[in-house]
From Swiss-Prot:
Predominant location category: secreted
Protein's organism: Mus musculus
GO cellular component terms, semicolon-separated: extracellular region
Signal peptide coordinates: 1-19
SMART domains on file: WAP
Coiled coil: none
WAP domain segment(s): 27-73, 76-128
Transmembrane in keyword set: no
UniProt name for this protein: Whey acidic protein
GO molecular function: nutrient reservoir activity; peptidase inhibitor activity
UniProt note on tissues of expression: Milk-specific; major protein component of milk whey.
Record bears the keyword Repeat: yes
Length: 134
């Protein structure tokens, strides 16, 4: 009987710990969608309690001076597929790369192209499709 009670209490404590961790993860992912305040923005805190109090597409979010109005930033979602494997990526080159950087994220590439490291530079590349095993 003691073992059963200990097990139940242990599971309850684990559930509480996981719930708190999940809440922190959700908060961190929401927080990362907003730009860091610039020195000018940092001096002006527009306090709010709910999103309805905010103009246009701004949202009420936790900040350094309480809940304040912030404008979300489009962080983009990675496109489907993977970057092709490139043997030259694993070999360190000597000297500067002669090619120009074309992109820094998938959203800068047209269509379904992905921003991948090819040779020594980031460039828009056709993706390798995701293969699902059944």
């Amino acid at each position: 009987m003691r073992c059963l009670i200990s097990l139940v209490l242990g599971l309850l404590a684990l559930e509480v710990a996981l719930a708190q961790n999940l809440e922190e993860q959700v908060f961190n992912s929401v927080q990362s969608m907003f730009q860091k305040a610039s020195p000018i923005e940092g001096t002006e805190c527009i306090i709010c309690q709910t999103n309805e109090e905010c103009a246009q597409n701004a949202m009420c979010c936790p900040g350094s001076c309480g809940r304040t109005r912030k404008t979300p930033v489009n962080i983009g979602v990675p496109k489907a597929g993977f970057c092709p494997w490139n043997l030259l990526q694993t070999i360190s080159s000597t000297g500067p790369c002669p090619m120009k950087i074309e992109c820094s994220s998938d959203r800068e590439c047209s269509g379904n192209m992905k921003c991948c490291n090819v040779d020594c530079v980031m460039t828009c590349t056709p993706p390798v499709p995701v293969i699902t095993l059944q």
